[in-house]
Regions:
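Receiver (REC) domain active-site loop signature in two-component systems and cognate sites
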Residues: 56
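Active-site beta3 strand of CheY-like receiver
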Residues: 45-51
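C-terminal output helix
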Residues: 89, 107-117
Length: 125
């Protein structure tokens, strides 16, 4: 199965690199550097997973996760928080806002497709 992912990160460089690596690995990817155009693509495209950076200027990933959990149409979409913050901090935030998982950016891009594939398999099936 080809998983559909929405990537959200305010760093265009990080976003482009993640999107490229994941697309090369067979994921369908929609990448967004701003939350302004976020809602309609999510509702229309029905992604299997949302991967969002934790620290962003408009609305951080934790706030986005909480907002998505309150919406009927998005409350069941798995959400992964992604950050270069220490694992303990990232894990605590993910638990507190109802994220399904967290990923450290420090692990590098090479491991990203396998980790997200495993998460999709575990969360969705």
């Amino acid at each position: 199965m080809k998983y559909r992912l929405v990537l959200i990160d305010d760093s265009q460089t990080a976003l482009d690199m993640m999107a490229h690596v994941l697309a090369e690995a067979g994921f369908e990817v929609r990448a967004m550097s701003s939350l302004r155009r976020f809602v309609n693509p999510v509702l229309d495209w029905k992604p299997h997973l949302i991967v969002t950076d934790l620290y962003m200027p408009e609305m951080n990933g934790a706030e986005l996760c909480q907002w998505l959990r309150r919406q009927v149409t998005t409350s069941r979409i798995p959400i992964v928080l992604c950050s270069s913050a220490p694992d303990e901090e990232l894990a605590a935030v993910a638990r507190s806002v109802g994220a399904d998982a967290y990923l450290s950016k420090l692990a590098g891009l090479d491991a990203l497709p396998e980790r997200l594939n495993t998460l999709c398999d575990e969360i969705l099936w």
